[in-house]
Amino acid sequence: MEQSFPLAQSLAAMAAISMLPVIAVIATSFTKISVVLLIVRNAIGIQQTPPNLLVFAIAIVLSAFVMNPVLQNSWQLLLAHSGDFGTVSGMADGMIKVAAPLKDFMLKFSDAEVRDFFVQASQKIWANAPATPIASDNITVLTPSFLVSELTRAFEIGFLIYLPFLMIDFAVSAILVALGMQMMSPTVVSTPLKLLLFVSIDGWRRLLEGLVLSYAQ
């Protein structure tokens, strides 16, 4: 008969808790949101405003909002299968069941082409491994696929956001050269104009709404 392992349960719980920050970064919307916010800050030209702490705090709050359905589903599954965590094998099965909503989330927002690449790469890199071939919905494929897909989308959004601010920089530089004011830094003039543009179009609300609603597919 399989015995209970309270020590193993404690160690597994500690390991799971220690992995939460990593999971929050690589398996949630945090990556895309934080990268887009940092790109916007650089595009405007205010390198330290808002500070990194505030940028990441905004990303955490928005990620918690986006991931709320996933967290609720995982919590309900944890309560429903709490009795399975009495043994080591039951604990492993229970963790797989609890992680199912997060796995579905990553599957939904990862590109099929990227998943296929990692499946093919695993067949080449792990050719001599004793493990059986993995599918495209395996967690070892989903995690890097989701991360790469999120980074790709973040840079696509950042490129589109960067363009109007870049045009302001070009226009200001051309005007200063035409006026013979080459000694004046274009940043001194362009930064207030970019801030004015961002505020006039209600940039923060539109940006954050767009980031949140991008997960409403």
What kind of feature is each model-predicted range?
Residues 1-217:
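Hydrophobic alpha-helical segments and their helix-loop boundaries in membrane
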